Structure formats: C-alpha cells, structure tokens
A protein has these predicted regions:
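Charged, glycine-rich intrinsically disordered N-terminal tails and low-complexity linkers that flank
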Residues: 1-99, 193-195, 200, 206-218
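Acidic-basic catalytic patches of nuclease active cores, encompassing PD-(D/E)XK
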Residues: 94-116
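Nucleic-acid nuclease catalytic cores
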Residues: 110-134, 138-218
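Homeobox/homeodomain signature
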Residues: 63, 90, 106, 112-113, ...
C-alpha cells in the first residue's frame, strides 16, 4: 500500500521507558552493522561477494516459478564478469538507477529532515549464504526514522502506482531480516531528462526541477 505519512511510531527520544528500550535496541544493532567489514559498494570485491551469496535483490526468484529458479541457479554457476557492471551504457536501467539513486536519497533526506547512511553488502549473522545491500539506513538518533532502512527504485518508463512489485516487497523483507531491523521505507522516483536548456525552461509541469553534474570515467 501507499501511505501519505510513513511515520508509524512515536519519537524514539520520548521519555517513555519502552520507547527508550527500543531506541537502545536499534542503536546497538546499528553499531553491530557498522562494525561489519564490508567491501565498498560497486567495488570488485563487492561484486564478488554478492555473487557468492543469495542477495535480497535476487532471492525473490526462488518464489516465482521453476523458470526463475533455474535462472538464479545459472546466475550463480556461470563465471562472474565484473566488467559488464562497469560498462558506461547510459541507456540501461542499471545505469539509470545508479545515476539517480543519490538524488533520490537526497530527496528522501530533504522531505524527512534526516540523514541516510550508506552500507555495503551485509551478510546474514546466522546464514552466511544470504546477504543484503540496503540503499541506506537512517542513523540519525534525533530523527523519528532512526533505524529505518531505505529501498530506492528509479523508474525508467513504467508508471508509479504506489504499490511495490512483489519482488521488491520480498527484497525488503530479506533486507530487514539480514539487518535485524523492523522497518524499511520504499521510495520510487521517476526522473525526466531534458535534451536542451530551452525545453527545461519551457516546461510548465509542477514537478520538482533542477540540474546536477555527473562525471563518467571513460
């Protein structure tokens, strides 16, 4: 479901005893996650580690069909080609998501007046073959969202309905299980690129507008 207000609990800094217990529990868990040695996102080590585990982003294939199960088996059995993830194909959905993920994160931080911390690929504390790479976790102790995870999808063409696709819902469940946290916000954004300055100026839509610079290694 889509909710206009994502705050589902009271301020964790409330003097209420139970809320303080919850705050301490979340704070302790975040310290545990921060202490885990993790490869940097999208580094060679990060891709290698992800390939050696079932991650939150692909584990949904187990539940879809026999075909998708075989797809997952093939992905894990074939040799890993890291270069395919580093190709500067600016038209691919993968590149689109990587390009606009920081912008989506800043938007989330802006509307919620908080800060999101990035994590790498986190292994499950008990089942080492399961891992998750959250797009971020709110680690600001003064925020009402303290301890909440964030999953971002940057839509290329499809319409945003406010209802997460099943594979995204499964992905968030696995992320919360791996990180031992109880909440995850799902943020879908859709960006429109203007081909020239004139189109940008003449656009009369009421959507948020702005410009940013992106540097690509050739």
């Amino acid at each position: 479901r889509s909710y206009s207000n994502s705050i589902v609990r009271k301020n964790l800094n409330n003097v209420d005893y139970n809320l303080n217990i919850n705050f301490n529990k979340i704070n302790n868990q975040l310290n545990i996650l921060k202490s885990i040695v993790q490869p940097d996102q999208r580094s060679d080590e990060w891709y290698i580690f992800r390939n050696s585990t079932l991650t939150a982003s692909n584990i949904y294939k187990i539940f879809i069909s026999e075909y998708s199960q075989n797809q997952l088996i093939l992905e894990k059995c074939e040799p890993l080609n890291i270069n395919k993830f580093k190709t500067n194909n600016t038209n691919s959905p993968l590149h689109w998501g990587q390009k606009y993920e920081p912008v989506s994160t800043m938007y989330y931080e802006y509307i919620n007046n908080t800060k999101v911390t990035e994590f790498g690929c986190i292994p499950h504390s008990k089942y080492s073959f399961i891992a998750a790479s959250p797009d971020g976790i709110v680690c600001d102790p003064s925020s009402e969202l303290f301890g909440r995870m964030l999953e971002i999808k940057n839509v290329v063409s499809r319409e945003i309905t406010g209802i997460p696709k099943m594979e995204y819902w499964i992905q968030m469940q696995i992320q919360m299980e791996v990180c031992n946290l109880n909440e995850c916000d799902f943020l879908e954004t859709k960006f429109t690129e203007f081909y020239n300055e004139e189109d940008y100026i003449n656009d009369i839509s009421e959507n948020y507008k702005g410009t940013f610079l992106q540097f690509i290694n050739n």
